[in-house]
């Protein structure tokens, strides 16, 4: 079974995806980490993120499991990630990687949960279950602001909200890789606890598998 979980930043999709994968013993892939991992590997090897050969080589040798303990959320890595993500050949390599992960889950597991921004629409358009997890911008900004503060990073709520609203606008207007698949089931987490969202999705998947 392939479960595609898409949604904007700080909607709660990552937390949900991990819990669903753990509950059903499915393989889990946070696709957002892939571009960061490629950016990190390019820098680690002394390469240039904008250089296609360096970036493609890093993408082709990527082993996400080997980077589980690496902090991929530094500004340097984020900057490198945005540069490698702009290279079509890198996007193609990672698209193939994601599709292979979904079709052949590691460890011989019975299913895969992929969390990202275009899983149901581009990566796995034939996924058995497509979810679009969302929440009001101000709620998502509140969550992200709290998350950054807990990590000891400087953050102000107005700045986080402005960033989230700008990103939402880019997503709404982009023609390539639309965020929400037309046949995805939308779940608004604004006024729901993580447990309530998990229970709702678990029940949907159990019904589907019955």
Question: Model-predicted segments: where are they?
Answer:
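Short, well-ordered beta-strand core segments
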Residues: 128-132, 184-186
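Walker A (P-loop) ATP-phosphate-binding motif of ABC ATPase nucleotide-binding domains
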Residues: 2
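Post-Walker A helix-loop "phosphate-sensing" segment adjacent to the P-loop in P-loop NTPases
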Residues: 21-31, 47-48
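Hydrophobic anchor at the beta1->P-loop junction of P-loop NTPases
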Residues: 5
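Conserved lysine of the Walker
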Residues: 13
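Walker A (P-loop) phosphate-binding loop of P-loop NTPases
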Residues: 10
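ATP-dependent small-molecule kinase phosphotransfer cores
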Residues: 34-111, 121, 138-146, 150, ...
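Hydrophobic positions on the alpha1 helix immediately C-terminal to the Walker A/P-loop
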Residues: 16
């Amino acid at each position: 079974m392939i479960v595609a979980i898409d949604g904007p930043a700080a909607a709660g999709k990552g937390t949900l995806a991990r819990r669903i994968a753990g509950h059903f013993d499915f393989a889990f892939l946070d696709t957002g980490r892939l571009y960061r991992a490629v950016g990190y590997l390019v820098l680690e090897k002394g390469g240039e993120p904008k250089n296609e050969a360096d970036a493609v080589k890093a993408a082709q040798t990527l082993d996400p499991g080997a980077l589980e303990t690496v902090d991929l959320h530094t500004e340097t890595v984020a900057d490198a990630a945005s540069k490698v993500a702009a290279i079509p050949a890198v996007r193609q390599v990672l698209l193939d990687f994601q599709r292979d992960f979904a079709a052949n889950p590691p460890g011989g597991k019975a299913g895969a949960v992929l969390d990202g921004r275009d899983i149901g629409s581009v990566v796995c358009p034939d996924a058995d279950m497509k979810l679009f997890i969302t929440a009001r911008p101000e709620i998502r900004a509140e969550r992200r602001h709290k998350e950054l503060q807990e990590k000891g990073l400087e953050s102000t709520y107005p700045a986080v909200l402005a960033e989230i609203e700008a990103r939402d606008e880019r997503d709404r207007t982009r023609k390539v890789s639309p965020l929400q698949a037309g046949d995805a089931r939308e779940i608004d987490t604004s006024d729901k606890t993580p447990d309530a969202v998990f229970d709702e999705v678990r029940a949907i998947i159990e019904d589907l598998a019955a």
